[in-house]
Amino acid sequence: MRKTVIVSAARTPFGKFGGVLKEVKAAELGGIVMKEALQQAGVSGDDVEGNVMGMVVQAGSGQIPSRQAARLAGMPWSVPSETLNKVCASGLRAVTLCDQMIRAQDADILVAGGMESMSNIPYAVPAGRWGARMGDGELRDLMVYDGLTCAFDEVHMAVHGNTAAKEYAISRREQDEWALRSHARAAKAADEGKFQDEIVPVNWIGRKGKPNVVDKDEAIRRDTSLDQLAKLAPIYASDGSITAGNAPGVNDGAGAFVLMSEEKAAELGKRPLATILGFSTTGMPAHELAAAPGFAINKLLKKNGLTVQDIDLFEVNEAFASVVLTCEKIVGFDLEKVNVNGGAIALGHPIGASGARILMTLVYELKRRGGGLGVAAICSGAAQGDAVLVQVH
């Protein structure tokens, strides 16, 4: 069977909620990274046979944001586009969907990734269509309602993160220690220039005509400590252990890849960054959200005849610190192999883009280390898990 290779990968810096990227729409962020990925790959928009971009909350963004992004990236009208929503797994699922298309010989060159501007997600008035008639009306925050709330249990994702911490006996201190590690490692990686390979600067003109350049992740906290983290109150559950400190922020950002069939890359003389060897997905009861990536990883390893010891590096999205620590209990991986340059707690979690970010961070780190096998895994709302296996030569 044919194999898919990653030829290029680029992402924006991740901005804080209402931060440096608040005036840049999701499709604009997507256009920036798609254009950069094409330039890195040395192919034009005319060469692309399709694109798939993940985006979770599309309300108010206009029709098919992925096609808007593709046009901004210079792709012609003839290139078809899809916008995909698998909650936090959207950016990773966009890649695996394109992998399936390439392996099925439906395409040879595709662009995949994810984007989200959580700062630009609107509020909605549910009764506005037909009228509230009498009494107060509701102003609904679509970022929370469509992006961060379980549609089945009607609770914030943090509640399910708390459930996992209790079930798997993960202490508040362990979660805070992981959060501190995430910030420390991300700060060190940033200082050493490790994110320069993946980050493309965002240039934009502010409302007052002032040019702005954003080239660094905004959310890394260099000054945090265990004492500071320990003082934070639990969120969404008074007896819980999830806090604003051991959970990621609300962020803006995008990431994209150029994917090719192995044969097409060879024909064009392209040296791949990585080869996609397989992927897996899993679904669980909604409250078991944090465990889903762990079971997806185990399923992926079994499917490919591998053990956890065969994998050189893991990237597990830090939807909460409890997610990584729950997966450690399920998979049994060495935590020293996980999120070695920090994770979403420090870098940010723009929900539609995070799956793309963890995969490219994994690939570039394996490349720096001279190659190896890596797994990127992520949970998503309603307790689904996605995992991807890559090899860097």
UniProtKB/Swiss-Prot annotation:
Induction: Subject to catabolite repression.
Keyword Protein biosynthesis set for record: no
GO molecular function: acetyl-CoA C-acetyltransferase activity
Keyword hit for Transferase: yes
UniProt keyword annotations, A-Z: Acyltransferase, Cytoplasm, Sporulation, Transferase
GO cellular component, one term: cytoplasm
PROSITE patterns for the chain: THIOLASE_1, THIOLASE_2, THIOLASE_3
Matches recorded under SUPFAM superfamilies: Thiolase-like
Protein's cellular compartments: Cytoplasm
Annotated InterPro entries: Thiolase, Thiolase-like, Thiolase_acyl_enz_int_AS, Thiolase_AS, Thiolase_C, Thiolase_CS, Thiolase_N
Catalytic residues of the enzyme: C88 (acyl-thioester intermediate), H349 (proton acceptor), C379 (proton acceptor)
GO biological process per UniProt: sporulation resulting in formation of a cellular spore
Reactions catalysed: 2 acetyl-CoA = acetoacetyl-CoA + CoA
One Pfam family per UniProt: Thiolase_C
EC id: 2.3.1.9
Chief location of this protein within or outside the cell: cytoplasm
Enzyme class: transferase
Protein family membership: Belongs to the thiolase-like superfamily. Thiolase family.
Record-given protein name: Acetyl-CoA acetyltransferase
